């Protein structure tokens, strides 16, 4: 469980531990503040669960291999990868250069890819390999003032859905969780967090997606306050191009969802050829 020192990650770690998982509680160390995973592990232990800490920053060189090794060295196996670590980053303005965008992508996308690569050999040996990518509806709809963050989460969604298709034969379940929660990352200055959106309200969905009982894969789930909804990309019916056609299709008549870009193209081709 990456990014599990507080907020959503801590709630997810505790929920999985309550279901019987032994959890690696990962979070980067900060020299100027306490190492919060220690407290998360203590709460898990007090509740009768099993957990250990890991202080690797997910974007550091070799971190993926070290994080995975923490689980293997301690328990000899790895069944679940929950990729929660991420940053919102500053607002990226046109003309500001690439540095801020690259930083957000390095943590929100590239680090997750590296962890998947490091974990896959072990997940393939597991009787119930599961990967849960923690994303955001910003990756589906965009976020005004946070274009880099939205781009990173949109890329993460596409990566996860593609990976789900690639790993279907390995029986590894891959899903995306887009939680709504009031955390330090989402809080506005001087604003009290909404108790309805406590991180625990999305934790049950995370624990289910990570469980052996979950037989779903290749899907995006939005969760918060103990509720859940499905999300997916949709395309409308097909019409010959004209400005009027764009106006008509913007209302999304006959919306269609697809399992992969290949299926979307095949359906489009059938519409234009009648075959």
PLM features per residue range, with description:
Residues 21-37:
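Conserved glycine-rich Rossmann-like NAD(P)H-binding loop of the short-chain dehydrogenase/reductase
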Residues 116, 152:
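Active-site helix of classical SDR
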Residues 136:
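Residue(s) in the substrate-gating loop at a strand-loop-helix junction
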Residues 66-73, 92-95, 99-106:
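Active-site Tyr-X3-Lys motif and surrounding loop/helix of classical short-chain dehydrogenase/reductase
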Residues 79, 87, 97-113, 132, ...:
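Catalytic Tyr-X3-Lys loop
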Residues 35, 57, 86-102, 145-148:
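Conserved mid-core segment of classical short-chain dehydrogenase/reductases
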Residues 1-24:
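Canonical Rossmann dinucleotide-binding motif of NAD(H)/NADP(H)-dependent dehydrogenases/reductases
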Residues 176, 194-275:
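C-terminal helical subdomain
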């Amino acid at each position: 469980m990456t990014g599990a020192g507080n907020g959503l990650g801590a709630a997810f770690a505790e929920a999985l531990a309550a279901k019987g998982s032994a959890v690696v509680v990962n979070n980067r160390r900060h020299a100027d503040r306490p190492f919060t995973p220690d407290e998360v592990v203590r709460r898990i232990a007090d509740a009768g669960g099993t957990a250990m800490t890991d202080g690797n920053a997910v974007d550091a060189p070799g971190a993926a291999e070290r994080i995975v090794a923490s689980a293997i060295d301690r328990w000899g196996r790895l069944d679940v990868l929950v990729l929660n670590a991420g940053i919102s980053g500053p607002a990226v303005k046109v003309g500001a250069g690439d540095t801020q965008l690259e930083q957000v992508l390095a943590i929100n996308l590239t680090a997750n890819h590296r962890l998947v690569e490091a974990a896959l050999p072990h997940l393939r040996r597991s009787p119930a390999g599961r990967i849960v990518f923690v994303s955001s509806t910003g990756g589906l709809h965009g976020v005004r003032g946070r274009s880099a963050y939205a781009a990173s989460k949109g890329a993460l969604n596409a990566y996860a859905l593609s990976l789900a298709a690639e790993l279907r034969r390995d029986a590894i379940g891959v899903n995306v969780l887009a939680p709504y929660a009031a955390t330090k990352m989402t809080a506005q200055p001087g604003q009290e967090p909404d108790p309805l959106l406590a991180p625990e309200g999305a934790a049950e969905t995370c624990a289910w997606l990570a469980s052996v009982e979950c037989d779903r894969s290749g899907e995006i789930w939005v969760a918060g306050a103990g509720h859940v909804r499905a999300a997916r990309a949709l395309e409308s019916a097909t019409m010959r191009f004209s400005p009027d056609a764009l106006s008509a299709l913007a209302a999304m008549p006959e919306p269609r969802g697809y399992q992969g870009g290949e299926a979307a193209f095949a359906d489009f081709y059938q519409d234009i050829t009648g075959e």
